[in-house]
Amino acid sequence: MGQAAAITMPIDPRNLNTLWSSVLAESFVRLGLQTVVICPGSRSAPLAIAFAEHPEIDAIPILDERSAGFFALGRAKASHRPVALICSSGTAGANFYPAVIEAKESGVPLLVITADRPPELRQCHAGQAIDQLRLFGSYALWEAELALPVLDLGLLRYLRQTAQQAWQQALRGGPVHLNQPLREPLAPIADPATQTWLAQQWPGENFFAELLTAVPTPQIQQPLPPLPSQGLITVGPIAPEDPAAFVQAIAQLSAHLGWPVLSDAVTPLRQFADHCPRLISSYDLILRQPHWRASLQPEAVLQIGELPTSKELRLWLTEQTCPRWIVSPRPENFDPLHGSSHHLPVTVEAIAIPATIAPASDYSRQWQQAETAVQAAIAQHLAQVPDLTEPGIARLLSQHLPAQTPIFVANSTPIRDLEWFWLANDQRRSLYCSRGANGIDGTLSTAIGIAHQNRPSVLITGDLSLLHDSNGFLQRSQLQGHLTVVLIDNSGGGIFELLPIRDCGPSFEPFVATPQTVDFAALCQAYGVDYQAIATEAELIKAIQTLPTSGIRVLHLFTDRRQNAAWRRALFAELAAIPSQS
């Protein structure tokens, strides 16, 4: 055999494990990998070194695997491309599970690589060895146990092609899992046998020439089904890669059909309101008024993606008998109402929309009149309550945060206040929320992942969500960018004050509301995070109109959850009593 090609790429020749791991890293880089989050460990050392030392990878070390998983989730949400996670063997990978679940449920691409003990050290109490096969159950879109590293060109080709398969599966939108068993030596100790084999056998650049990057499959234009004139479009939580194209498609659809658009707060539509004149943002509150609830019944519904967060809307749709067309390229069932639904397996941008524009109908005008009346009632109500109510905070943020700001919204009360009180605007902000599994875990870490290498970003969160993931502050030194945390501290779970459980008796406060006694100023100081207590609306506006460019800052706002719940209930009662002619 002739002389092998020179090694001119990031292939580590020191020993078998470094060679194998660097081939895996280089394969993923060629496929498009840019970011990897690495958790510390010994068994994963060959993988960590290969990915961390690759010149084209942004490698981020994070101590806590749970926090790391959510950071990767946030980075993948913002970049719309797979982010890799690497950890050691044992329970380390299990800590990725909550983020993997959220990634699966919300269609976010993650590439999870867990190091493992070799087969002979499993099921024999060798230590730090658990069953890592199917570690994530049904939540991995695809998974594989990789072969033990071997000096064999055929097996290196297998490794390269398995990497390509994993990447293509992740691009479907969700997590994939590769489990990599490794034998000693785990340190990059030089092995002459590996170097000799490489000198004789390595094919050089030709090895990666066979690696094919994913080619986007062109979507076939989907014609609209026959639809009546009295219908509506709902848009659930979504952060599309091209917000302007997404908004344009829905605006064209609305114009052609003459239908109103009921958009969740976490979509681009409320940030591009000037593009969508039939946008309805206060539908949850409109449907609390009995006359509107009865008179606004549609003859058909186009549901874009998931249903909006609003429970009121979902209950109302359950009462309808009309067909509902669900537009989503994902194959899951997006009908939790179990109604007369039909799946259109495309993106909304792929719908063939005729150029004709429908005139405004009485039905559409009714929705617009209701929207105007409700927004006026909200403004009047907020003018009568003190500074820094939770509804007022949501409204102020929608009015005063800089244009194009990326915003991550915590679950529980914050996302509902955005749904009710966030003003539609034309500020082109990007809103995100973990509405796959709807948990509060990983809130801070996900927000930091979104802020990394991004515009100065904002997290809107309650105290419990922040405390649940306070380890995320450890990522402060890794963050390339800035995150402002708007901390709405109402000393417990404010959402439960709006639910019947609030009347359960003495168990409510300690076991449901679960107030915590934490000095947030001291907590921020311990992590080296900037802290500012906010006491007035004027202070909040001044603090958010211009955002810093680096580091993490907490703006601490104190609210009373019982008073805020009472104000919301009073507003809901006012809206239910609005005269029907409004």
UniProtKB/Swiss-Prot annotation:
GO annotation, biological process: menaquinone biosynthetic process; phylloquinone biosynthetic process
Gene Ontology molecular functions: 2-succinyl-5-enolpyruvyl-6-hydroxy-3-cyclohexene-1-carboxylic-acid synthase activity; magnesium ion binding; manganese ion binding; thiamine pyrophosphate binding
Record's catalysed reaction(s): isochorismate + 2-oxoglutarate + H(+) = 5-enolpyruvoyl-6-hydroxy-2-succinyl-cyclohex-3-ene-1-carboxylate + CO2
One Pfam family matching this protein: TPP_enzyme_M_2
Keywords assigned: Magnesium, Manganese, Metal-binding, Thiamine pyrophosphate, Transferase
Function: Catalyzes the thiamine diphosphate-dependent decarboxylation of 2-oxoglutarate and the subsequent addition of the resulting succinic semialdehyde-thiamine pyrophosphate anion to isochorismate to yield 2-succinyl-5-enolpyruvyl-6-hydroxy-3-cyclohexene-1-carboxylate (SEPHCHC).
Name under which the protein is recorded: 2-succinyl-5-enolpyruvyl-6-hydroxy-3-cyclohexene-1-carboxylate synthase
Lineage: Bacteria, Bacillati, Cyanobacteriota, Cyanophyceae, Synechococcales
